[in-house]
C-alpha cells in the first residue's frame, strides 16, 4: 500500500529540498570563490564584512578567510626598504594591506581593520590609510622568512619613507606575531 503526501506537504518538501540545494550551492560558491582553502598551516585569519571566505566560524557565527603562506604569497607582492624603528634599515617583502582587503572583497562601508597578534595585542588601521599608503603585512625581511623568534611569520610594516605616515602610526603600532585581521565598520 503506497502512501502519497498531500499536495500541501508535497509542495513543502519540494520547497525544502530546493532551499537546501540552493544553500549548498551558495556555500560551495563562497568557498570556491576564494580560489582555494589552506593546505598548509594557517598563518592569518581575516574576519568581518567581506564577500570571499573559505571557512565558517561557528563560534563567531560568520564566515572567515584563512590563509596559509602559499595563499598569502598569491596576493600581489610588494617590497620596500624602510627604517624599522626597532631593527634599523630593512627591506621587507609581503602584501599591501589594501591589496589583501581587495582580494577578499571587503565591504565598501568598512572603515577600519584591527590587527590581532598572537599575544592578544591589537592595533587599529584605518582602511582609507591602507588605501593611501603601502602599509604591508610582511613575511620576509632582507629576503629571509621572518621567523617566529623574530616576530613572524607576519608583521605589520609602515612606509615611514613617506612623509606623514610615522605621525599617523608611530613606532608602537608596528605589530609582530600577526595572526588575524578583523574588518569593522
Name what the model sees in each region.
Residues 33-185:
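N-terminal intrinsically disordered, low-complexity segments enriched in P/E/S/T
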Residues 11-19:
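Bacterial N-terminal signal peptides that target proteins for export
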Amino acid at each position: 500500500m503506497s502512501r502519497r503526501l498531500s499536495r500541501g506537504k508535497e509542495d513543502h518538501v519540494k520547497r525544502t529540498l530546493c532551499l537546501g540545494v540552493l544553500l549548498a550551492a551558495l556555500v560551495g560558491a563562497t568557498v570556491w570563490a576564494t580560489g582555494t582553502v589552506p593546505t598548509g598551516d594557517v598563518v592569518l585569519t581575516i574576519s568581518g564584512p567581506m564577500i570571499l571566505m573559505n571557512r565558517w566560524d561557528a563560534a563567531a557565527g560568520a564566515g572567515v578567510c584563512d590563509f596559509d603562506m602559499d595563499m598569502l604569497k598569491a596576493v600581489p607582492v610588494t617590497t620596500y626598504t624602510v627604517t624599522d624603528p626597532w631593527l634599523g634599515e630593512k627591506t621587507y617583502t609581503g602584501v599591501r594591506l589594501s591589496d589583501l582587503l581587495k582580494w577578499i572583497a571587503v565591504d565598501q562601508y568598512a572603515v577600519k581593520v584591527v590587527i590581532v597578534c598572537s599575544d592578544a595585542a591589537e592595533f587599529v588601521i584605518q582602511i582609507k590609510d591602507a588605501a593611501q599608503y603601502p602599509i604591508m603585512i610582511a613575511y620576509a625581511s632582507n629576503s629571509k622568512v621572518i621567523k617566529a623568534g623574530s616576530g613572524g611569520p607576519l608583521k605589520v610594516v609602515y612606509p615611514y619613507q613617506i612623509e606623514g605616515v610615522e605621525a599617523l602610526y608611530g613606532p608602537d603600532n608596528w605589530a609582530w606575531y600577526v595572526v588575524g585581521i578583523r574588518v569593522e565598520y
